[in-house]
């Protein structure tokens, strides 16, 4: 029998996670996250007790799990983070720059998440710093914030970096310098430089035997297959998105809060679920 009804992410985990775990043996950090989601605001993480000073009425509130991966826990931390960031954002133009890698790299990145996510940050930062300091483009030290996203709009695996870039910077004399309202870096140049820097990090990790290969990435243990992968990625035009999307500092930090306190499994994306009894 198949039953369909509206549900939350917590409902889905409560109904299906136990059988999923038996079939798939997920790693410890996945099991921990599942436990947090299933037990959030159930009393498993303790309670808060409030007593009215006037009438003595007692209210008991179950604590949240406070896991970053729990879609029920992020609204308050998001607002708290936004408030803390207000002092770090200038009243100046900001630009949204997204650094994306080809899908061909997904399996090897998934097998080496810590190393190759770090490489994404390194390559994006080095690209922005190098080009911004070039007098041909700006000739200044810029400010930016990088945020890693690991999923796409279809909730597929899609690692990429969102970067909020200040539309100007400080020159060698610590004086403000900008380009008068337009973004100072050509999109095509950003893509090519980022591609070169990320691929250099990937090759360096391979040469130092620091990469692991699991699942569909196992074939890249072979040096010939790995070189084929590199060649294919060098031939591609890496997609870089650049656009001024903000109207003032407050819009910037609100946007950042949405990305730093959000995961793929938000409840509104999972309105209905099918339950099959076996």
Give the location of each predicted region.
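Short "domain-exit" segments at the C-terminal end of structured domains
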Residues: 273-278
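Beta->alpha loop/short-helix hinge microenvironment recognizer with preference
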Residues: 1-272
